UniProtKB/Swiss-Prot annotation:
Gene Ontology terms, MF aspect: aspartate 1-decarboxylase activity; pyridoxal phosphate binding
Protein name from the UniProt record: Aspartate 1-decarboxylase
KW Lyase (keyword) present: yes
InterPro entries: Asp_decarboxylase_pyridox, PyrdxlP-dep_de-COase, PyrdxlP-dep_Trfase, PyrdxlP-dep_Trfase_major, PyrdxlP-dep_Trfase_small
Gene Ontology CC annotations of this record: cytoplasm
GO biological process terms on file: pantothenate biosynthetic process
Length: 547
């Protein structure tokens, strides 16, 4: 530990030391490394503060905008991080943190991550990555085979082909979706005659040449917001993302899709892509992928499947049928940092046809030369870390049967929780789980009885107070720090398709137990009873209706 009367200096000798000499085992950082390797969960429990602290208070620790003019000892700075940053982080790996698409991670990833950081490979080019490039190509090939199931000869021919790629690693699903639609756009508005293609001449010239007024991307109203980002970046415009109605199971409505396509074509707007969602963010629902593929084929447009969440289900022989038709996609997005259990920052887009990515191929004499196997020729992002190493390791250590166990238990746990909710007099299941995601809300039995006989006007009033009560329960539960569920807004049939605030849970963490789920409901019930505004108002309205 550094004494108070010693200060660090910015000499070149001290700078060389931080590049070449590790921290001593008894230093703050050395002790932390030991704690992390011995008991990660205990370290997180001890250092992350459970109680909620207002963001305005946390911001007070991060207000100095001036660049430090004097260095700080590593141990001293580590203590600072523990006090200000680690303590106010979110314990996303906690078994009771079931509100978002996060989970505990396998222990072996921590030391492997240190190796990855130490190697500091840059996957843009073979000269800065060497073996990491064929490894990444292999991982993309493994996922391609999981989705599309081609024969050995296909992968022997294409997986390491210099001028082709089976997909791209990305920082996440957003870049993966943008990449898929970038390929779709460049293929649709390809070179023809004197027109040199959209990549060379731009969108305005492309629309003029192809004599259309715009492009359209069709996706369900439950589609991810990244698709609007993609439309914005690609020059299509956010209005070019056409939201298609969903049915009562939150799956895209095919009749409305046909209507929206006809309306777009009547305005001389060209269908660019149909996007099927395999695991919506809000409800975990899966669109009818096979039927969407048929529509896309008929319209001659790109069929993309956003399986950022649900794609890992393909690992399960028991449940992969839920993604029936995904093999008909032109491209598929999968996030490894979701149900493939690697750290944040690993998404992928996989293309069925190895030729497709040639439409976005780029070259630069100093780095991305023609004929090279550099991955950067086909990726939106340039410099990238070797995250494929961590996914490759998970594939080998966990294996497909291991992933199947993880996927199966998560889905079965969701069904257990759904059944548990339905057994309660004062809770109501809103959406049945297709994968391991479901929504529900707290509705006291007397409120249910009142809703059965209430007028439409009275129902609207009850809905408003139920929404306020749901927000109160969710916020209080988060601030208390024992457990966490998120909330979202849906338009369920049971509530006359009115915007309705509901609890949302994601059960991907293998450490989440049935007892934890039982306690979540018990805690929510206790919090509801402590409400001093919403619940009394509800009881007053309900009392007037029932009496």
């Amino acid at each position: 530990m550094v004494t108070d009367n010693k200060t660090a200096d910015a000499s070149f000798e001290s700078l060389l030391r931080i590049f070449t000499v590790p921290e001593a085992p008894d230093s703050t950082l050395g002790i932390i490394e030991k704690e992390l390797s011995q008991n990660l969960n205990q370290f997180l429990r001890e250092h992350i503060v459970a109680e909620e602290k207002p963001l305005t208070e946390i911001e007070k620790d991060f207000t100095d905008s001036s660049m430090p003019e004097s260095p700080t000892y590593v141990s001293e700075h580590t203590e600072h991080l523990l006090d200000t940053l680690v303590s106010q982080s979110v314990h996303t790996s906690a078994p009771s943190f079931i509100g978002h698409m996060t989970s505990a991670l396998p222990y072996f990833l921590m030391p492997l991550s240190k190796i990855m950081i130490a190697l500091n490979q840059n996957l843009v080019k073979i000269e800065t990555s060497k073996a990491f490039t064929p490894l990444e190509r292999q991982v993309l090939g493994m996922l391609h085979r999981l989705i599309f199931g081609q024969k050995d000869s296909f992968y022997q021919h294409w997986m390491h082909s210099a001028d082709h790629s089976l997909g791209a690693f990305c920082s996440g699903g957003t870049i993966a979706n943008i990449t898929a639609l970038w390929v779709a756009r460049n293929r649709l508005l390809k070179p023809e005659g004197d027109f040199e293609g959209i990549a060379k001449q731009g969108l305005f010239a492309a629309l003029m040449h192809y004599k259309c007024n715009g492009l359209a991307i069709f996706v369900s109203e439950r589609g991810h917001y990244s698709l609007k980002k993609a439309a914005d970046v690609l020059g299509i415009g956010q209005d070019g993302v056409i939201a298609v109605k969903t049915d009562n199971n939150n799956r895209v409505c095919l009749d409305d899709l046909e209507l929206k396509i006809a309306q777009a074509k009547a305005k001389n707007i060209k269908p660019l892509a149909i996007v099927g969602v395999a695991g919506t963010t809000e409800t975990g629902s899966i669109d009818p992928l096979r039927e969407l593929a048929n529509v896309a084929q008929r319209e001659g447009c790109h069929f993309h499947v956003d399986a950022a969440w649900g794609g890992a289900t393909l690992m399960s022989n028991t449940y992969r049928h839920l993604l029936d038709g995904i093999d008909l996609a032109d491209s598929v997005t999968i996030d490894a940092h979701k149900q493939l259990y690697v750290p944040m920052g690993a998404g992928m887009v996989i293309f069925k046809d190895p030729e497709l990515m040639s439409s976005i191929q780029h070259h630069a004499e100093y780095i991305l030369r023609k004929g090279s196997k550099d991955l950067g020729r086909h990726t939106l992002e340039g410099s990238r870390s070797g995250m494929a190493m961590l996914l490759y390791s998970c594939f080998n250590v966990i294996s497909r049967p291991g992933y199947e166990l993880l996927i199966n238990q998560s889905i079965e746990k969701a069904h257990y929780f759904a059944d548990l909710i339905q057994q309660q007099d004062d809770f109501e299941l809103i959406t049945e789980p297709e994968l391991c995601l479901l929504t529900y809300r707290y509705v006291p039995s007397n409120v249910k009885a009142a809703l059965a006989i209430a007028t439409d006007e009275q129902k609207i009033e009850i809905y408003e107070h139920l929404d306020n009560l749901t927000k109160y329960i969710q916020k209080t539960q988060r601030e208390t720090g024992k457990s966490f569920v998120s909330r979202t807004r849906l338009t369920p049939e049971a509530y006359q398709h009115q915007p309705t605030i509901v609890f949302r849970v994601v059960l991907a963490n293998p450490l989440t137990t049935k007892e934890i789920l039982q306690n979540v409901l018990i805690e929510q019930r206790e919090i509801a009873s402590s409400s001093e505004i919403s619940l009394p108002l509800l009881n007053q309205i309900v009392g007037n209706i029932l009496h």
